Amino acid sequence: MTSPIRIGLIGMGTVGTGVVRVLKNSPEHISRQAGRAVLVDHVVVQDPSKKRSFELPSDQISNDFAQVRDNPDISIVALLLGGLEPARTLAIELLKSGKDLVTANKALLAEHGPELFGVAHEMGRSIAFEAAVAGGIPIVSAISECLTGNRISSIRGILNGTSNFILTKMEQDGSDYHEVLSLAQSEGYAEADPTMDVDGTDATQKLALLTHLAFGQWVPWASIPRFGLESIDQ
């Protein structure tokens, strides 16, 4: 009998809760897709006592990182933290403990990609990040799997949904930038602090990751020329 895949999660916010809910509510479907059962073994959060929309048994959730890092039964860890630290440190520890990683943290990979992928290569581990860049396409698997025999000469695309929404509304309706930004925030297209979206940071970090996939080179994301939306009036 094939043994199940046991996964750990670091963080259980909106994305983490969704991951746990899918795995818990659709075990047969997931098992067919993966070829064997996929089980949530342990989830690490800051406050295990916090009320959540999807509750886990008390022995499956804690604030003890070692419960995931040092568990030999866990082979894959979903690192669901934003920002650079402690995400970078935890990622390195997990890779060195023999875990494969899944993350959507584009800022982490764009900033520390060479180091993290270097550790992964050294340990014979992998880092999956489909959700970090245009996951709806999905572009990461398209480049790394479907187009491996193709020579890519350039990459063009819309990589930031917030900017796309704002520019489209400004062009079609002739609306003012600040007016459309407020609309985007009220409708959930923009964060309360939209800085990284409207100044080009989000798009350049994604482009840095795509550049690595397509051309095998790490380009510092901050060195990529970018022009934000703040100075556009109409």
Which ranges hold each PLM region?
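Oxidoreductase and adenylate-handling cofactor-binding alpha/beta cores
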Residues: 139-152, 163-178, 205-219
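Rossmann-fold NAD(P)-binding glycine/threonine-rich loop
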Residues: 86-96, 106-144
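A short hydrophobic/small-residue beta-strand
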Residues: 101-102
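Short glycine-rich anion-binding loops that position phosphate/pyrophosphate groups of nucleotides
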Residues: 82-84, 132, 160
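Substrate-binding/catalytic subdomain of NAD(P)-dependent oxidoreductase enzymes
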Residues: 179-234
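N-terminal glycine-/serine-/threonine-rich beta1-alpha1-beta2 phosphate-ribose binding loop
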Residues: 1-97
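NAD(P)-dependent dehydrogenases' Rossmann-like dinucleotide-binding region
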Residues: 152-163, 225, 229
